[in-house]
UniProtKB/Swiss-Prot annotation:
Gene, per the UniProt record: RIM21
GO cellular component: plasma membrane
Recorded family membership: Belongs to the palH/RIM21 family.
Domain of life: Eukaryota
InterPro entries noted in UniProt: PalH (IPR014844)
Cytoplasmic side: 118-126, 198-209, 265-279, 331-519
Membrane topology recorded in Swiss-Prot or TrEMBL: Multi-pass membrane protein
Protein name per Swiss-Prot or TrEMBL: pH-response regulator protein palH/RIM21
Coiled-coil segments: none
Keyword Cell membrane: yes
Keywords from the UniProt entry: Cell membrane, Membrane, Transmembrane, Transmembrane helix
Species: Kluyveromyces lactis (strain ATCC 8585 / CBS 2359 / DSM 70799 / NBRC 1267 / NRRL Y-1140 / WM37)
One GO BP annotation of this record: cellular response to pH
Length: 519
């Protein structure tokens, strides 16, 4: 029988006399394979049907016309099925194992179908490709394993007339392909859980920190877990250095699942006005149940040996359920929040780190120019009234200062070029009536420019920090001074912003009245 990790508790094995052989006295042996179907035997050693030192017989009700068991065999069989040990009672039989594995397989396939056929509304977010791949691999892995189990059970029952739960456990524990695919599935589902936790935070810096920290913990857990899983099983008399690794990693997995459940429950408490409203009550309770099912299952796995035997199958289903159901719950909560933000006056909160490539500022300036164009066209349609008002404003501005004429000419010239500005995606000059915006936008750098900047930084710090610290700065006196001067000049131009002359700078001019200053 394939053994598990030695850190778990194992019930002491009992010795059954019927499995070791029973000396029978002389008598008549009736056997179908004998020439005359029966024979007179003076002495015979009878060995019962046993596997791994435990008897194997049918638990069905015996018929009255059947031959009874030998007294020693009947005694061993009754003591085996009635003791409180491991694999003896009916709950450890093959029937309970088959029912549990089949139900677990159906739940996994059901969750996989939900992942693929669920079409969320537009504000929601569909399942990621990582979650889809993990769910698909989990279903395929369990499907192949269940088919192998059914085939093995059918063959054993056909040729032997009995089926033992130990044969199923040997097939589960000895299948390295199943264990390897299961590790990949758990890794993908844990990545999906990290993505769900990232959605609970609004700032990009917080999301980035959650992703890096979660990915680090997942990699450490999977690397430590794969070592004892794929390593040879130690024997009873041998000592191994990796015996301490499985319990440590198992406790680490319990801690990770508990942290995930704590984050979900904290988010439920912060959004309790949305979580416990109408149809969301049932989904919220189901979410809490699934996230707490995983740490509870881990704890029960340590204390219950029957769950310990099937832990690799149950763990995958728990990971998948705590990911798929929480994702659906998160989508609905975010949909309700966006509806509330859309109905409010201020909308949703916007943070500084969301302003990447100045999308909000560019959008605001374009909308401002569009409104100004619409207003100018409306004024032009009204005819002489608007023209007289503009002429009056021009005369007042000419009387106040000499610079106002340049402002008006600039405004008129830029009104004619606004259509060209809106047609291109480049950031150009945006103006308002009577003022200018002081804005400078950074242009998105190409990939090769970023690589060039990284290479320049590496060369700079290598030359000036590492090499000078080891060999001294006088070692590089043989190089030409012109190249160093050009390099310093280029850095200075980059520091003050002169390396990008095509960037547009907008300045704001205001007119001041001398009367207001004197007052």
């Amino acid at each position: 029988m394939t053994g598990r990790s030695r850190w778990r508790y194992h019930f002491p094995s009992e010795d059954y006399s019927s499995c070791q052989g029973v000396q029978l006295d002389e008598g008549v042996l009736i056997w179908n394979k004998l020439p005359d179907k029966f024979a007179y035997i003076k002495s015979l050693v009878f060995t019962s049907n046993c596997q791994d030192g435990t008897p194997l017989y049918s638990s069905f009700v015996e018929l009255e016309d059947e031959c009874p068991y030998l007294p020693i065999v009947a005694f061993d069989w009754n003591s085996y099925i009635n003791n409180d040990g491991y694999t003896g009672p009916f709950k450890y039989s093959i029937y309970s194992v088959i029912y549990s594995v089949t139900a677990n397989f159906i739940i996994t396939v059901f969750l996989t179908v939900i992942v693929f056929i669920n079409v969320p509304t537009k504000p929601s977010r569909k399942a990621s490709y990582i979650l889809k791949l993990g769910a698909l691999l989990a279903s395929l892995n369990l499907s192949i394993f269940v088919i192998r189990v059914w085939k093995n059970i059918a063959e054993n029952y056909t040729y032997n007339g009995y089926v033992s739960s130990t044969s199923f456990l040997n097939l589960l524990w000895g299948d390295k392909v199943f264990a390897g695919i299961d590790l990949v599935v758990v890794f993908l589902l844990q990545i999906s859980q990290v993505q769900i936790v990232m959605r609970f935070f609004d700032r990009m810096q917080e999301k980035r920190m959650v992703f890096y920290f979660g990915l680090f913990l997942i990699l450490v857990t999977q690397i430590l877990w794969v070592i004892p899983t794929l390593s040879p099983v130690p024997t009873k008399d041998s000592d191994s250095d990796i015996d301490i690794l499985p319990p440590f990693v198992y406790l680490f997995r319990i801690a990770l699942s508990t942290c995930y459940a704590s984050v979900i429950c904290f988010h439920v408490l912060t959004k309790k006005s949305l979580c416990f409203r109408g149809r969301m009550i049932f989904l919220t309770l189901l979410t809490i149940f699934t996230v707490f099912l995983h740490p509870t299952f881990f704890i029960v796995d340590v204390s219950n040996l029957w769950i310990d035997d099937l832990s690799e199958i149950f763990n995958t289903t728990c990971y998948l359920a705590s990911t798929v159901i929480v994702l659906e719950w998160t989508n609905r909560i975010h949909t309700m929040e966006r509806k509330i933000h859309a109905a409010s006056v201020l909308g949703r909160p916007i943070y500084e780190d969301e302003e990447q490539n100045f999308h909000f500022a560019i959008y605001a300036l374009r909308m401002q120019n569009a409104m100004k164009m619409h207003r100018d066209g409306h004024v032009h349609d009204h005819g002489h009234t608007c023209d007289s008002n503009d002429n009056a404003n021009v005369s007042l501005q000419n009387a106040n200062t000499n610079d106002s004429s340049s402002i008006i000419t600039d405004n008129s010239s830029q009104r004619t070029s606004t259509f060209g500005t809106m047609a291109t995606d480049q950031v150009t000059l945006h103006t308002q009536q009577g003022e200018r915006n002081i804005t400078q936008f950074k242009r998105a750098e190409t990939f090769w420019n970023k690589c060039h900047h990284v290479l320049e930084s590496i060369v700079y710090y290598t030359d000036n920090v590492m090499v000078n610290a080891l060999a001294g700065s006088k070692t590089f006196d043989s190089f030409t001074n012109d190249a160093e001067k050009l390099l310093k000049t280029e850095r200075l131009r980059k520091t003050v912003g002169l390396d990008e002359p095509e960037d547009v700078y907008l300045y704001r001019k205001t007119t001041m009245s001398s009367d207001s200053v004197m007052e």
